[in-house]
């Protein structure tokens, strides 16, 4: 009998849906006993992919431990000491809480990366996706509010006194969280476990004719859009880009531009640079999130 052709996409049976496909990472996790009969091409690529997934998981766990510790300490300090409850620190507190939402979801993402599928079900998929999106938008909106607060403190120091108060900062923070949740409603509605149709997985060798068929099901936590999917996906990308990046970026740049215009005639160049030194930092944080 002739050896099986290892060319991807070559049909191994007359049935139209039975196609050969090399999936070494999935075999390594779900069907390790089949690696002995896989092709040389597959066995050579498995250690690399397995090591890559393991390294990514280690990085995720490291970020989880360090981030959880640091953000928890920041939250504790602001809540524990009354003198720390300033307007700026209240916004920083909300940034730390938003980061904790993302950090708590890292073990789930690391597990999906190692196993190459989502094993936690639909509910946790929606929770993790929502927490991740809430982190992004809440952090961005908090940075924007902090820029507005800086603008009020520098340009309108007297008139803004009644607005720059911890009680007002708490109300603004609550509004930021509410707006963020409204913004991420598409994620809450459309995130789910995506299940690809089961199909036979066929493995052969060049030395002998050997075929084993295994039913493969690949689950991933993702956004599942209604038809037409391309239109929904593109609209969501544009929507998040405008609301979560370009809009806040415009407000932040405008605030610091007005600050520069206000103080440039009253301060030296070095002092002006000190006042606006946090603007590039805010923009970098905005682009990172």
UniProtKB/Swiss-Prot annotation:
Protein's UniProt keywords contain Acetylation: no
The record's disulfide annotation reads 125-221
Its placement in the membrane is given as: Multi-pass membrane protein
Where would I find glycosylation on this chain?
A: 40
SUPFAM superfamilies found in the cross-reference section: Family A G protein-coupled receptor-like
Q: Name one GO biological process term.
A: cellular response to glucocorticoid stimulus
Pull the Extracellular topological domain ranges from the record. 1-57, 111-126, 192-240
User: PROSITE patterns given for it?
Assistant: G_PROTEIN_RECEP_F1_1 (PS00237), G_PROTEIN_RECEP_F1_2 (PS50262)
Q: Where are the transmembrane segments?
A: 58-79, 90-110, 127-148, 171-191, 241-261
Per UniProt, subcellular location reads as: Cell membrane
Pfam families in alphabetical order = 7tm_1 (PF00001)
Which sequence ranges are listed under topological domain Cytoplasmic? 80-89, 149-170, 262-289
Q: Does the keyword Protein biosynthesis apply?
A: no
Q: Which GO terms describe its cellular component?
A: neuron projection; plasma membrane
Question: What molecular function terms (GO) are annotated for this protein?
Answer: neuropeptide binding; somatostatin receptor activity
Keywords of this entry: Cell membrane, Disulfide bond, G-protein coupled receptor, Glycoprotein, Membrane, Receptor, Transducer, Transmembrane, Transmembrane helix
Q: Which domain of life is it from?
A: Eukaryota
What protein family does this chain belong to?
A: Belongs to the G-protein coupled receptor 1 family.
According to UniProt, the name of this protein is Somatostatin-like receptor F_48D10.1
Species of provenance: Takifugu rubripes (Japanese pufferfish)
